[in-house]
């Protein structure tokens, strides 16, 4: 990206709507409730012939530095300092407020290029607010409607004028373009029945951080990044949007998604919280590995178990992180207790990796990252057809399929049809009659014999073809 733009403004002027318009996706939550956005959200924007990095920020109101609003202000100031240009969004329909004047003064002190964006200019009676924006002393305002996409060409011209042609259109680098699929399926399409493809350790890894409110998810990500990138504090439910951040771990790009705390469905009443939870679910589906953060001082609440079950039903690789380990006194006894409860309460994820950590002190973070990588390897694993059929034969010798209605089931052939998560197809007689207990027996055997701990395993059955049936039809 050639340059970076920060979107600045008081609450509810349409900053996130403009952000979504420029990135071409609904990445940021949008609602009539003021203060929806709290963290900095980056994205890749395109405006006519301009391509740039854009940062959505929290709506700013003056408050004490220690308050939540004060910490949000500090995050927005960091975005302004990082950016080459600020889009200062005002509400042309509602007109200017003292908060707009305060923000204008702050931007003037920064001394960086600013474009005043008079949003909602399509509304009746917005002319007064548009002309008032001249009094901010930051140049001619650009009238737009972020919701309807009006005025985007004028906004493009205003950005180029503020930055200058050279900064807006830097010379193209002489680098060959490469089309890279960010979601390759390891080993998909491999024909050799004995070949098991190697794990690709170069591709970026997408990791979602989920858990109950106030489990320490944002603190954990800040510790990974080594900076206060995300808002944290004692208040529950600070995070609303799913915010993505990128960093490098031992030469590999990690893209982490911070998500809103997930409460029990019965407690989620407000529309905004429902939107936040839906955003967290999208992050889970987009991720490859999901870290479920537990509060080690009150682990295995019912909601914790429901979140783990949700992640596994979505087919994601899962890792448990027992956070706030620095607050635990008798940690040896707790560790034994957690291991026992993990095996007993999560039978559907037998062998799942669980790591004690502290987002506050940094304890256990290297072990957590190693667990994430190892779990992702398992999630991507493919097993050759030849090995699977030798294994299937041995399983039937040890524990033959049951007889149903006086006829014994026959499992004839097995292959892995997908990875991410591992999925297998078994050809057999009467697939609809295979008992659930025998399916669990096969899944447990696959998990133990092929070292597939902590990931969902899918086993499906299909009817095996009778080679004589088609010949009989022809004779008729």
From Swiss-Prot:
**CDD domains in alphabetical order:** EngA1, EngA2
Give binding positions for GTP 1.
Answer: 9-16, 56-60, 119-122
What residue stretches are annotated with the KH-like domain? 381-465
The protein's UniProt keywords, in alphabetical order, are: GTP-binding, Nucleotide-binding, Plasmid, Repeat, Ribosome biogenesis
Name a Pfam family for this protein. KH_dom-like
The EngA-type G domain extends over 3-167, 205-380
Q: What GO terms describe the biological role, i.e. biological process, of this protein?
A: ribosome biogenesis
Functional summary from the UniProt entry: GTPase that plays an essential role in the late steps of ribosome biogenesis.
Q: Which family does it belong to?
A: Belongs to the TRAFAC class TrmE-Era-EngA-EngB-Septin-like GTPase superfamily. EngA (Der) GTPase family.
Question: What is the name of this protein?
Answer: GTPase Der
Q: Which organism is it from?
A: Rhizobium meliloti (strain 1021)
Taxonomy, top ranks, is: Bacteria, Pseudomonadati, Pseudomonadota, Alphaproteobacteria, Hyphomicrobiales
Gene designation:
der
């Amino acid at each position: 990206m050639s340059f970076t733009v920060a979107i600045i403004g008081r609450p509810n002027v349409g900053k996130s709507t403009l952000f979504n318009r420029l990135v071409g996706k609904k990445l940021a939550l949008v609602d009539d409730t003021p203060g929806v956005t709290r963290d900095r959200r980056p994205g890749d924007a395109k405006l006519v012939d301009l391509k740039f990095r854009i940062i959505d920020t929290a709506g700013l109101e003056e408050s004490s530095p220690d308050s939540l609003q004060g910490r949000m202000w500090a995050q927005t100031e960091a975005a302004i300092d990082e950016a080459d240009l600020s889009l200062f969004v005002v509400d042309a329909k509602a007109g200017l407020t003292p908060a707009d004047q305060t923000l204008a003064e702050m931007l003037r002190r920064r001394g960086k290029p600013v474009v005043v964006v008079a949003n909602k200019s399509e509304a009746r009676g917005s002319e007064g607010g548009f002309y008032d924006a001249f009094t901010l002393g930051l140049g001619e305002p650009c009238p737009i409607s972020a919701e309807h996409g009006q005025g985007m060409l004028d906004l493009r011209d205003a950005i180029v004028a503020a930055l200058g042609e050279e900064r807006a259109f830097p010379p193209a680098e002489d680098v060959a373009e490469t089309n890279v699929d960010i979601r390759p399926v390891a080993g998909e399409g491999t024909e050799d029945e004995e070949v098991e493809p190697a794990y690709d350790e170069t591709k970026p890894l997408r990791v979602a951080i989920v858990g109950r409110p106030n489990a320490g998810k944002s603190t954990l990500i800040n510790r990974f990044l080594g900076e206060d990138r995300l808002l944290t504090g004692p208040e529950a439910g600070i995070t609303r949007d799913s915010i993505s951040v990128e960093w490098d771990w031992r030469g590999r790009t990690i893209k982490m998604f911070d998500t809103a705390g997930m409460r029990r469905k019965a407690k989620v009443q407000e529309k905004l919280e429902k939107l936040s939870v839906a955003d967290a679910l999208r992050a889970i589906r987009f991720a490859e590995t999901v870290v479920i953060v537990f509060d080690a001082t009150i682990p295995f609440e019912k909601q914790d178990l429901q979140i783990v079950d949700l992640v596994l039903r979505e087919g994601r690789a899962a890792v448990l992180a027992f956070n706030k380990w620095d607050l635990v006194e008798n940690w040896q006894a707790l560790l034994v207790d957690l291991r026992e409860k993990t095996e007993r309460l999560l039978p559907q994820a037998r062998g799942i990796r669980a790591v004690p950590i502290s987002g506050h002190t940094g304890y256990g973070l290297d072990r957590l990252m190693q667990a994430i990588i190892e779990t992702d390897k398992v999630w991507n694993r493919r097993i050759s057809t030849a090995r699977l059929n030798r294994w299937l034969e041995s399983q039937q010798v040890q524990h033959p399929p049951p007889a149903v209605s006086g006829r014994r089931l026959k499992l004839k052939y097995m292959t892995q049809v997908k990875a991410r998560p591992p999925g297998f197809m078994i050809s057999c007689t009467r697939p609809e009659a295979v008992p659930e207990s025998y399916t669990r027996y096969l899944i447990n055997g696959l998990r133990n014999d092929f070292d597939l701990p902590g990931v969902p395993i899918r086993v499906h059955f299909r009817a095996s073809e009778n080679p004589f049936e088609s010949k009989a039809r022809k004779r008729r």
